[in-house]
Amino acid sequence: MTATVVAAAATATMVSSSSGLAAARLLSRTFLLQQNGIRHGSYTASRKHIYIDKNTKIICQGFTGKQGTFHSQQALEYGTKLVGGTTPGKGGQKHLGLPVFNTVKEAKEKTGATASVIYVPPPFAAAAINEAIDAEIPLVVCITEGIPQQDMVRVKHRLTRQGTTRLIGPNCPGVINPGECKIGIMPGHIHKKGRIGIVSRSGTLTYEAVHQTTQVGLGQSLCIGIGGDPFNGTDFIDCLEVFLNDPATEGIILIGEIGGHAEENAAAFLKEHNSGPKAKPVVSFIAGITAPPGRRMGHAGAIIAGGKGGAKEKISALQSAGVVVSMSPAQLGTTIYKEFEKRKML
């Protein structure tokens, strides 16, 4: 390990007790530093697994529990190709007419699963994610809220050093390709197959954007809830790359909130990769414009700390990248519709 990496890691350790967000920034930078001449950027190779469709085969970790049972039933009714699930000690049984396995590795071998959704209590959720990584499941969606940040630091450290498994979440609603595949807790009936890619840190605001784009007749191509925790597996840039490369996605809605610097990074990415006459229209809303500094607002990552992470700075960065920022979540649908109208895309 180089001296640079050691110094960065030591600094992150000192800061972690006083500021989780500062630690997150330092750790994320550390992960991108060179170690022994090798840049650990292979995790970006797993972005392709974010896209799901009718052929995606899913297993559920925590299958026989209350949450796992309810949401698995909802997924099956939606038409999702759920092929089984895991609950340690209950292997060999049937649940919802599907096989139960003791381990993720066995479930993958027997079902050919390409994705896993996790409904496991917070103290055990990180272990469930690690088990899915061990089994080389291409896509892991963790719904669980309240996972200890120290657990997720370790998970993130491991994720960034491999390129086989992509994690969405934790503390997120999941991902849905309307009419084809639903992985998570979102209400399926408000979605409609269409043209808008939606990515959000907030679950309920995702549903608001979905409902509005359905109402104005644009629908959705893919909707991704990345979660509001400071240590998550997928960020805005990961999703934006998927949307920009997806021919079915003609416009994008990005919903951010105070805390961290994910929105500023997304703005820089859009400025570089989504400009010129063929740029896709992007509309955004940033929650928390009136939030007081130093107070956490709902999500663990939604906090203005050290004078950074405020809504105004995020809005300014997005606008400088050509993003149309709506001042109200109630206007997301009409705003993206007007952008389509302006560009003669209707």
Swiss-Prot record:
One of its GO terms (biological process) is tricarboxylic acid cycle. The modification N6-succinyllysine is found at residues 57, 66, 338. The active site is at 299 (tele-phosphohistidine intermediate). It is found in: Mitochondrion. It catalyses: succinate + ATP + CoA = succinyl-CoA + ADP + phosphate; GTP + succinate + CoA = succinyl-CoA + GDP + phosphate. Residues 1-34 form a transit peptide. It is an enzyme of class 6 (ligase). Pfam families: CoA_binding, Ligase_CoA. Pathway: Carbohydrate metabolism; tricarboxylic acid cycle; succinate from succinyl-CoA (ligase route): step 1/1. The modification N6-acetyllysine is found at residues 54, 57, 66, 81, 94, 105. Its EC number is 6.2.1.4, 6.2.1.5. CoA binds at residues 64-67, 90, 143-145. GO terms for cellular component: mitochondrial inner membrane; mitochondrion; succinate-CoA ligase complex (GDP-forming). Substrate binds at residue 207. GO terms for molecular function: nucleotide binding; succinate-CoA ligase (ADP-forming) activity; succinate-CoA ligase (GDP-forming) activity. Keywords: Acetylation, Ligase, Mitochondrion, Nucleotide-binding, Transit peptide, Tricarboxylic acid cycle. It comes from the Eukaryota. Heterodimer of an alpha and a beta subunit. Different beta subunits determine nucleotide specificity. Together with the ATP-specific beta subunit SUCLA2, forms an ADP-forming succinyl-CoA synthetase (A-SCS). Together with the GTP-specific beta subunit SUCLG2 forms a GDP-forming succinyl-CoA synthetase (G-SCS). HAMAP family: Succ_CoA_alpha. Succinyl-CoA synthetase functions in the citric acid cycle (TCA), coupling the hydrolysis of succinyl-CoA to the synthesis of either ATP or GTP and thus represents the only step of substrate-level phosphorylation in the TCA. The alpha subunit of the enzyme binds the substrates coenzyme A and phosphate, while succinate binding and specificity for either ATP or GTP is provided by different beta subunits. Belongs to the succinate/malate CoA ligase alpha subunit family. This is Succinate--CoA ligase [ADP/GDP-forming] subunit alpha, mitochondrial. It comes from Mus musculus.
